């Protein structure tokens, strides 16, 4: 990995050059680009050249690659706007004094102008949480479907490019990527990172910028405290307010869930007790997890305090779903109970109908027997003897007993003879 540290804040750059001017390089001008030496294709860039010599009339030229006609024989004082830039503008530039036609001063140090947006942007993959503890190492990966020869990682603080890290690509099955390890982390490593891809044959022509990743350093100050204004047991459709309080004179407070920042910071307010506080209003739909808060200052927004103790919040959606599930369960139980009651009622009706009918039949039979007994009470004592003979389907019924066996006195005994003639 090759590290190249560049400062593109022109005032700071000039301060360093003025210090070196007193050390023997008085006639040498210095050159920088504003707002950055990485210029998106189609935009303009301002070249600034300055020195202690008077009068300050300069010329600038491009050392390599295609010549820029816009710069040919053009003089300027201190600044020169060029663009809209194309890939031909990529390269190394120098400036020099042009006081008299035959007098040319020493040339400035080279300034690289890089044109971005030539290729499709890569993707910068950050750690699971963008919050890094002081002293840790952080690994960022730049991925692309294009087989770039090299990747460049840039760090921005206060919208100014601070550092460029270059790493050769590593092939994988779906393109190429490069890993960048940063650390041990200090406040100087915090900031916004982006990455680019490029080819070795045109190192001044980069891809479009990846989406930015913010890396924040924690643990630089004492931790605040986080609490809920109301009970942490959430009620459906009810907002939750979290309060972050500290004795430290923080200017901003930040909220995170499971290590991921939640929205932007909130300005701190001093309470009646003299403490500094910020209140975070959460929407009715809350994701469950451990919440923490941090304190910071406006002039170093990427440097945070140690995290507060965690405050666990359940998800309101889960409670709502639980209420729905309980309601469905109660409804199912009621339906089952109603079905069971209906079945029991049907069984009782069938049972009642069956035994009512049987009782009616038994009563009718009892009435018939009682009627017969009332009509002929002495008949029960009669002795009946029946003889049946079958002969050609002719029936003869003799109610008279044989003469030889007839007693002299009348007898109530009756013998019935029946002959059947077949």
Curated annotation (Swiss-Prot):
Q: Which residues lie on this side of the membrane: Cytoplasmic?
A: 351-422
Q: Which InterPro entries match?
A: Ig-like_dom, Ig-like_dom_sf, Ig-like_fold, Ig-like_Receptors_ImmuneReg, Ig_sub, Ig_sub2, Immunoglobulin_dom
Q: Where is the Ig-like C2-type domain?
A: 42-100, 135-202, 237-300
The secretion signal range is: 1-21
What does UniProt give as GO cellular component? plasma membrane
Provide the membrane topology annotation: Single-pass type I membrane protein
Among its keywords, does the record have Cell membrane? Answer: yes
Indicate where this protein resides in the cell: Cell membrane
Family assignment from sequence similarity: Belongs to the immunoglobulin superfamily.
Q: What is this protein called?
A: Killer cell immunoglobulin-like receptor 3DL1
- Species of origin reads Rattus norvegicus
